[in-house]
């Protein structure tokens, strides 16, 4: 899945790298600051057809789902989004991109040994320590921006009301990409990302992008980072630095 991203570069850098010719910034640059630990409920930048960039709530719940008191969702599966009630309309009319510099994953690992134990060597060994949930940061080896496929029901400059927002599309993880679970964000190169934004793209082409255009695992690197990333209110550059 994708539940935490970094998006710390200037918006103009994402636009230039993507090859936008006339980007339209629909946000106040004065109020924007680098995001190293963006979680659902925050407002990452999204890129829309027409080259507009806008800060969008991460989380989505259509009106019919809200009426049934169903929870908002933050991800959509690439394999099923085109046919599920939550996302089938957005799949064709609400494709956007979330520019990112990396994302976080967690996996259970053995707890580090206690280097300061004063236990008597003659005492029986204590029970094995519980595994810890270790965060990892995943980024491109070339440390360039990446573009996450996303869906949104926000249009133009209309106000965002309850239930409106975006979801990040996930795909099956490659063999070799950090062995956490079987999902990862659907990450595009700039060329594939521009095609994803094309509102005239036919359904078979959308499906082809979702199934075959994901950046392969060999182009990524990942490493352990501070467990402070578990705290959504902590948003500092040190969170994407490798642990010694």
Residue ranges with predicted function:
Residues 1-244:
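Short linear sequence motif anchored by a di-proline
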């Amino acid at each position: 899945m994708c539940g935490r991203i970094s998006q710390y570069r200037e918006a103009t850098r994402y636009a230039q790298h993507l090859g936008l010719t006339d980007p339209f910034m629909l946000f106040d640059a004065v109020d924007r600051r680098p995001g190293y630990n963006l979680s659902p409920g925050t407002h990452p930048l999204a890129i829309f057809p027409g080259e507009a960039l806008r800060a969008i709530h991460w989380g989505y719940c259509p009106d019919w789902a809200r009426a049934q008191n169903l929870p908002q969702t933050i991800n959509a599966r690439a394999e099923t989004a085109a046919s599920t009630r939550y996302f089938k309309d957005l799949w064709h009319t609400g494709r956007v991109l979330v520019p990112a510099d990396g994302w976080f994953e967690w996996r259970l690992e053995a707890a580090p040994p206690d280097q300061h134990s004063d236990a008597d060597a003659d005492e029986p060994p204590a029970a094995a320590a519980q595994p810890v949930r270790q965060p990892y940061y995943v980024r491109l080896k070339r440390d360039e921006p990446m573009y996450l496929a996303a869906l949104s029901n926000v249009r133009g400059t209309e106000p965002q009301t309850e239930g409106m927002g975006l979801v990040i599309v996930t795909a099956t993880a490659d063999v070799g990409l950090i062995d956490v679970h079987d999902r990862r964000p659907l990450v595009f190169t700039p060329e594939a990302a521009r095609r994803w934004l094309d509102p005239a793209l036919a359904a078979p082409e959308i499906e082809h992008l979702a199934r075959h255009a994901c950046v392969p695992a060999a182009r990524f690197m990942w490493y352990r980072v501070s467990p402070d990333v578990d705290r959504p209110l902590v948003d500092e550059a040190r969170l994407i630095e490798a642990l010694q």
